């Protein structure tokens, strides 16, 4: 279809002026086709069908207008009603998704572009934007998604542990969400390998900002999962380091924060060396996107 050529040349919104006549069940096929094409091309797809005034011959047109984005139908008109539908297409998100792929060009040689002017008007947002797009609303779907995420991560870690012949896994537990998830994944990987949870070296490393709540959470979690609990305070070591480099401990700047992160990483690495283990990272994609990491500081 022409839409493929346009998308390959960088078009992120396809407008299809169509005259598709009506037969029984064709509306479902049409919606699947439009939604599927928008997913394949990573684009917004506006399908504008002919209405009831198009022809007096032996065919009928229903004005079945559809707006889709990356596989999702945003709006569709009621057939035979000559309705106007409108919605918003998240072009920036589509562009971001395309940058992760090498299929789509900015423009290929020989492709004709026709410039035009369009007045931009401020309008009210009609489309619902989910503040948590990766979290299903249904409890059943949410549990299935969480189990799937844990299984994917656990299988990846299982393969890595097998490949490196590591005898243990070493993980820093803060009591926060990231390290909690990493520990749960590690436990599942060990279960898949049939390894004792005591070979998981779960280390708490209290620092200047550690609260009783996060510390208690960490200890309770480790004991509940029957991992090997270890505690190493970083306060004395970090104070010595600050003295060596002339850092005032009262100045809570990036050096203050990273000094603690680096000390924790050193401890975990040394324990891993001592036990023939692997350090399990607790960073997440948000950290990666923002350019900083729990691992060894920024």
For the regions a language model picked out, list residue spans one by one:
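Flexible inter-domain linker/hinge segments
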Residues: 1, 84-85, 89-161
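CN hydrolase (nitrilase-like) catalytic-core segments centered on the catalytic cysteine
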Residues: 2-85
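Active-site adenylate/phosphate-handling loop in enzymes that bind or generate adenylated species
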Residues: 4-12, 190, 225, 249-298
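Secondary-structure transition/capping motifs at alpha-helix termini
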Residues: 40-41, 72, 160-167, 188-200, ...
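A conserved beta-strand->alpha-helix junction
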Residues: 84-86, 115-133, 195, 199-255, ...
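Glycine- and acidic
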Residues: 131-145, 164-173, 202-204, 248-254, ...
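A phosphate-binding catalytic loop at a beta-strand-loop-alpha-helix junction
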Residues: 149, 153-194
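Short glycine/threonine-rich loop-to-helix capping motif typified by GTGT followed
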Residues: 173-186, 213-217, 245, 294-297
């Amino acid at each position: 279809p022409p839409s493929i050529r346009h998308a390959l040349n960088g078009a992120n919104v396809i407008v299809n002026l169509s005259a598709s006549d009506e037969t029984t069940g064709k509306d479902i096929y049409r919606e699947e086709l439009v939604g599927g094409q928008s997913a394949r091309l990573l684009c917004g797809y506006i399908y504008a069908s002919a209405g009831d005034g198009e022809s007096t011959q032996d065919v009928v047109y229903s004005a079945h207008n559809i707006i889709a984005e990356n596989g999702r139908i945003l709006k569709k008109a009621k057939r035979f009603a000559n309705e106007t539908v409108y919605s918003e297409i998240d072009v920036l998100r589509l562009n971001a998704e395309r940058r992760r792929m090498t299929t789509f060009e900015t423009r290929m040689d020989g492709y004709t572009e026709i410039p035009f002017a369009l007045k931009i008007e401020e309008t009210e947002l009609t489309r619902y934007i989910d503040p948590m797009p990766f979290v299903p609303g249904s409890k059943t779907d949410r549990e299935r998604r969480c189990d799937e995420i844990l299984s994917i991560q656990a299988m990846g870690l299982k393969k890595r542990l097998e490949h490196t012949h590591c005898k243990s896994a070493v993980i820093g537990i803060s009591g926060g969400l990231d390290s909690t998830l990493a520990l749960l994944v590690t436990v599942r990987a060990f279960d898949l390998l049939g390894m004792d949870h005591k070979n998981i070296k779960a280390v708490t490393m209290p620092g200047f900002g550690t609260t009783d709540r996060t510390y208690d959470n960490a200890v309770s979690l480790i004991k509940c999962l029957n991992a090997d609990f270890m505690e190493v305070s970083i306060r004395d070591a970090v104070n010595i380091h600050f003295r060596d480099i002339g850092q005032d401990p009262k100045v809570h700047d990036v050096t203050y924060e990273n000094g603690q992160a680096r000390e924790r990483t050193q401890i975990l690495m040394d324990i891993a060396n001592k036990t023939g283990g692997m350090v399990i990272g607790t960073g997440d994609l948000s950290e990666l996107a923002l350019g900083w990491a729990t691992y060894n500081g920024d």
